[in-house]
Design a protein with these regions (language model features):
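N-terminal pre-triad scaffold of radical SAM enzymes
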Residues: 5-8, 206-241, 254, 258-262, ...
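Radical SAM enzyme core and accessory elements
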Residues: 1-33, 78, 231, 455-544
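Conserved SAM/AdoMet-binding glycine-rich loop
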Residues: 10, 259-387, 393-395
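Flexible glycine/acidic-rich beta-alpha junction loops that bind and position SAM and/or redox cofactors
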Residues: 105-111, 271-282, 315, 345-358, ...
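Glycine-rich beta-alpha loop elements in corrinoid/cobalamin-binding modules
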Residues: 64, 80-210
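A solvent-exposed, charged loop/short amphipathic helix patch at secondary-structure junctions
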Residues: 24-55, 104-131, 356-365, 445-455
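Catalytic cores of alpha/beta
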Residues: 159-168, 323-324, 396-412
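N-terminal [4Fe-4S]-dependent radical SAM core
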Residues: 20-23, 57, 185-225, 267
Length: 544
């Protein structure tokens, strides 16, 4: 293999360095342990290896890495994204390896749910640990000056596992929006031989403006393109709302669309916390901006989806502007007959919405939330748009009545094509303990909610899978997915609330036994400066 003359390498483990067979939602399988299938087959389905060039550069890479790559290249640094299978020879010669991840240690949902329900380590955690062990081994034996920088949306997880910070010889943890300012600043310090902070927090005041966000230089996984950053809704449990709400200008979006189209990519994803709020001020839909965005996207992509959209925005857009109908008329044709995206229901309890997430219902009231959810699902079903919706189980102060209100809402949603995925609320502090899973205490009503959601999702998944993966190309994957769904449905139909609770307790016991068998990690001799305090470290306004 030929090697590039570079100073910095960007990488991530196999569960993210993949195109998931061109189907982004298949990637959610990497948040689970192998179930029913052996690990190699599970990974072939969920995370096949991408094509690489003669230097080990993947043809497609996660969008976040592409943004960091573009930022460093524009500032004159020698950098490349390298596939993990081709990483080792680069580690022997580069000055730094930079890793970005959505869920380093499987602490985020739905990884923590799968881990909790099965008692087995999800594959994303397994592959991340293997990657970090490789990096640490090379640093220890062949390149002691190598700097290891970890960043990305899940960088916070390193603060809860200081033993891994030590074991994997991590030099700097970067939390917050880091790609445009903090990472180039760190890169320059490395070249200048200056000391790196062990922990760097990039606060909202240091978030880049849209002018400072670069256009990517290489293809992203599944043609994903960012259209907005931040969220104006202000839910208590979500960190995204802390970031300023910004919209990427259409000319930058078009440059990234054109890049993909010129390389034969004609299917993709528009990424934002709420695509329907593109061009909006606050939560007030801007229909002209949304229509222009979709007309532009359709010019380059034959088919595409949204990463996320809010249910209250769906209702507002249709009630006020008939926008969902207008979008359906614009984008659906012989190449595209449905659109999928993620969204959040979180709860069917108006009381919890009022307390924790008033903005989720805006411009409507928390009291209206269950009706807003059902109306949104009805609108989406009518227009062949398919939501994958999350619920949060075990919010602080949640009562039995709150859970039953959520069960009632899920029952109302049965007629509508959708996936509904319940997620466990885990207090952040619990992750400091290896027995974090003991903090999750399920009650009978929680188990009933899990059972109802599973049956709902399996029912609709059997229909959706044919739309999502049509044709001979996907026949093997489609067959494997249907086999798995049949197995899951068999178990779900036989399950009761009592058996589910028993299953979860068995999983906890299994996890506890696994922890007891692991060799004891040496105690950290000295606290990592800044790790526990999480105090902001100021980043220069302009990195040079």
């Amino acid at each position: 293999m030929k090697l590039l003359d570079i100073d910095f390498v960007l990488t991530v483990d196999r569960t993210l360095m993949t195109d998931h067979h061109g189907k982004e939602f298949i990637g959610f399988m990497t948040t689970a342990p192998p179930v029913f299938f052996p690990e190699k087959l599970w990974m072939w389905i969920a995370a096949p290896k991408p094509k690489v060039d003669e230097y080990g550069r993947p043809v497609v890479a996660p969008y976040g890495l592409r943004k960091v790559e573009a930022s460093l290249l524009e500032k004159g640094f020698k950098v490349a994204v390298i596939d993990p299978d081709y990483l080792e020879p680069y580690l022997e010669r580069v000055k730094a390896v930079m890793i970005g991840h959505h869920d380093y240690f499987a602490f985020c949902p739905p990884s923590s749910e799968w881990w909790m329900l099965t008692g087995r380590e999800p594959v994303n955690r397994r592959y991340l640990l293997r990657l970090m062990r490789l990096i640490a081994r090379v640093k220890k034996t062949r390149n002691p000056d190598l700097k290891v920088i970890v960043a990305g949306p899940a960088a916070w997880q390193w603060l809860y596992v200081p033993d891994y910070v030590d074991e994997f010889m991590v030099d700097c943890i970067v939390e917050g929006e880091s790609g445009e300012k903090a990472i180039p600043w760190l890169a320059q310090r490395i070249l200048d031989g200056e000391e790196l902070p062990r922990y760097l927090y990039v606060g909202p005041a240091d978030s880049p403006s849209v002018e400072e966000i670069p256009v990517i230089k290489g293809l992203s996984v599944n043609g994903l393109i960012e259209v907005s950053r931040g969220c104006p809704r202000g839910c208590k449990f979500c960190s995204v709302t802390l970031r300023p709400f910004r919209h990427i200008p259409l000319d930058k979006i078009e440059a990234e669309l054109r890049l993909h189209a010129e390389h034969g990519v004609h299917d993709g994803i528009l990424h934002a916390e709420d695509v329907l709020l593109y061009g909006a001020v606050g939560v007030n839909v801007n229909p002209d901006a949304v229509l222009k965005l979709h007309a532009l996207t359709k010019k380059y992509y034959k088919s595409f989806g949204w990463s996320h959209a809010a249910l209250a925005t769906v209702v507002q857009a249709q009630r006020r502007f008939k926008l969902i109908s207008r979008l359906a008329d614009m984008i659906f044709d012989e190449h595209m007959d449905f659109l999928g995206f993620q969204t959040g229901i979180e709860t069917g309890s108006p009381r919890l919405v009022e307390r924790d997430m008033r903005g989720k219902a805006a411009p409507y009231t928390p009291r209206e939330w269950p009706d807003i959810v059902e109306e949104a699902f009805s609108i989406l079903h009518e227009h062949n748009m398919i939501p994958a919706a999350t619920l949060i189980i075990g919010l602080p102060g949640e009562t039995e009545d709150d859970v039953y209100k959520t069960i009632e809402l899920v029952e109302r949603l049965k007629p509508y094509r959708s996936m509904i995925i319940p997620l466990f609320f885990v207090p952040m502090g619990a992750f400091r303990r290896k027995d974090w899973f003991l903090s999750i205490q399920l009650r009978e009503e929680h188990a009933e909610l899990l059972r109802i959601c599973l049956l709902h999702s399996i029912r609709w998944a059997k229909e959706i899978i044919g739309k999502y993966m049509p044709g001979l190309r996907y026949a093997p994957v489609r067959w494997a997915m249907r086999l798995f769904l049949a197995w899951a449905e068999y178990g779900a139909r036989r399950a009761t609330a009592e058996t589910i609770l028993g299953f979860v307790e068995q999983a906890k016991e299994r996890m506890a036994r696994q922890e007891a068998r692991e060799p004891l990690v040496k105690r950290i001799k000295a606290r990592i400066s800044g790790v526990f305090g999480r105090q902001p470290v100021e980043v220069p306004a302009r990195a040079t």
